């Protein structure tokens, strides 16, 4: 592809940017770099968009340091980074929960006379929330934005509402929603975020009230809205009510996308009604919907639930023959499915092959592997993967602490828990109780007293 473009005399900076963007999306960063060099040789100079595209690719698929190195090359080429440059770097660092790096990038922006925009602050707030630093996130909303002369818009509130809901602070989210209503009309996405949060908290009545508010605002519930409510019914084992809602909406003329069918199928799988699940999948095909990666993921989940590994292998072969690209969820299903069916070595081999194929190892897959290996009794193997993880969240640490306790490694669990407190990572009190009671049960009374005192001291220091 690159060689062909070198011979193309009509190459312009705009075309160069389009090609670089395509290569980056397909993770072909080396080819993108070669294309830029070839463009320069042909007299086509890259601009800030070219480098920003490259930086975004490195942030997503390689690493922050590699992405940051591109900014030095930009300046060497006489091109000044802009706010979009730093937003990509900030997003990449925030995705990896590298708060110190995010704050450093903010400082550097200001030093270069580049002012953060709403997107920059939205990303910072999201990072604070993921790390459990809620006060800092609200300080950004009520103080930093005001000092920067920026007015929070719907996107800012959506970020905050989504973070509050995911952290379980539903009442705070509802209060913030009222504040938002006093400033401007919430978007359909806002209602969907709140309905999703309420459904995950299993607050059925409030979710129904929010749906009524959505309709009063002049919006029509979309597939996302109803799929969210369907999932609530299915999670609370109200399978019959969920199926009734699904059929009612179909009769009323609502067009369901594949996701609604997959929600129905997933619920039927979880309740052991695999025959009905197959029938719904066949109905989806009869309606003219070809299998895409989402439907294949649902089928993979179905086959793993049945323990039908032969069908899994056949389906993976079909995906490959059709030239379809498995997504992160596909690989998570495979790793989780293999672990649940006792195929721990195959799960590890697949996990390792993901890295070899250049597939980003997302946090969910890593957590899944570590937790699954621990539960299968392979704690030492799990800990090796845990130590190699670049990004860890509250679930990672909580899972490992509990699994270490189950394996009677209370001292190790205590040290890990203390490191979490020192880093300001919020861990459920159940993990603290498990560690302290385990130390006492194993006769380590001195260790228990020492650990309790250190935990208390650290918690007071972080408050």
Curated annotation (Swiss-Prot):
PROSITE patterns: PPR. Pfam families: PPR, PPR_2. Keywords: Repeat. InterPro entries: Pentatricopeptide_rpt, PPR_P_subfamily, TPR-like_helical_dom_sf. PPR repeats lie at residues 12-46, 47-81, 82-116, 117-152, 153-186, 187-221, 222-256, 257-291, 292-326, 327-361, 362-392, 393-427. GO terms for molecular function: mRNA binding. The keyword Phosphoprotein does not apply. PANTHER family: MITOCHONDRIAL GROUP I INTRON SPLICING FACTOR CCM1 (PTHR46128), PENTACOTRIPEPTIDE-REPEAT REGION OF PRORP DOMAIN-CONTAINING PROTEIN (PTHR46128:SF307). Belongs to the PPR family. P subfamily. NCBIfam families: PPR. This is Putative pentatricopeptide repeat-containing protein At4g17915. It comes from Arabidopsis thaliana (Mouse-ear cress). The lineage of its organism: Eukaryota, Viridiplantae, Streptophyta, Embryophyta, Tracheophyta.
């Amino acid at each position: 592809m690159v060689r062909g473009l070198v011979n193309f005399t009509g190459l312009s900076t705009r075309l160069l940017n389009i090609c670089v963007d395509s290569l980056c999306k397909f993770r072909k960063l080396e080819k993108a770099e070669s294309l830029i060099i070839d463009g320069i040789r042909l007299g086509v100079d890259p601009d800030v968009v070219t480098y920003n595209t490259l930086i975004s690719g490195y942030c997503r698929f390689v690493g922050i340091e590699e992405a940051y190195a591109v900014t030095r090359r930009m300046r060497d080429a006489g091109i000044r980074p802009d706010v979009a440059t730093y937003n990509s770097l900030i997003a990449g660092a925030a995705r990896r929960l590298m708060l110190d790096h995010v704050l450093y990038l903010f400082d550097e922006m200001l030093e270069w006379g580049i002012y953060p925009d709403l997107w920059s602050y939205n990303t910072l707030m999201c990072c604070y929330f993921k790390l459990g630093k809620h006060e800092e996130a609200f300080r950004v909303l009520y103080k930093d934005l005001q000092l920067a002369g920026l007015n929070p818009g719907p996107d800012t509130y959506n970020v905050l509402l989504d973070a509050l809901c995911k952290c379980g602070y539903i009442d705070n989210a509802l209060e913030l929603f009222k504040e938002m209503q006093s400033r401007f009309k919430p978007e359909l996405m806002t209602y969907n975020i709140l309905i999703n949060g309420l459904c995950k908290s299993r607050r059925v009545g409030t979710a129904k009230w929010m749906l009524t508010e959505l309709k009063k605002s002049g919006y029509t519930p979309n597939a996302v809205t109803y799929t969210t409510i369907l999932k609530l019914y299915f999670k609370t084992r109200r399978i019959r009510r969920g199926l009734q809602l699904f059929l009612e909406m179909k009769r009323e003329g609502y067009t369901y996308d594949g996701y609604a069918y997959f929600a129905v199928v997933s619920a039927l799988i979880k309740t052991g009604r695999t025959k009905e699940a197959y029938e719904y999948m066949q109905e989806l095909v009869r309606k003219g919907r070809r299998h895409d990666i989402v439907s294949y993921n649902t089928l993979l989940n179905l086959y793993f639930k049945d323990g039908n590994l032969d069908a899994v292998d056949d389906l993976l072969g079909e995906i490959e023959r059709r030239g379809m690209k498995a997504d992160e969820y596909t690989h998570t299903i495979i790793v989780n499915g293999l672990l649940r069916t006792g195929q721990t070595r195959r799960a590890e081999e697949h996990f390792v092959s993901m890295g070899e194929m250049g597939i980003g190892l997302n946090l969910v897959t890593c957590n899944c592997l570590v937790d699954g290996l621990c539960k299968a009794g392979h704690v030492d193997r799990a800990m090796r993967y845990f130590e190699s993880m670049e990004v860890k969240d509250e679930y990672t640490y909580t899972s490992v602490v509990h699994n270490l306790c189950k394996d009677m490694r209370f001292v190790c669990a205590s040290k890990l828990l203390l490191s979490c407190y020192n880093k300001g990572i919020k861990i459920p009190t159940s993990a603290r109780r498990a560690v302290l009671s385990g130390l006492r049960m194993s006769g380590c009374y001195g260790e228990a007293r020492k650990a309790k005192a250190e935990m208390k001291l650290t918690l007071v220091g972080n408050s």
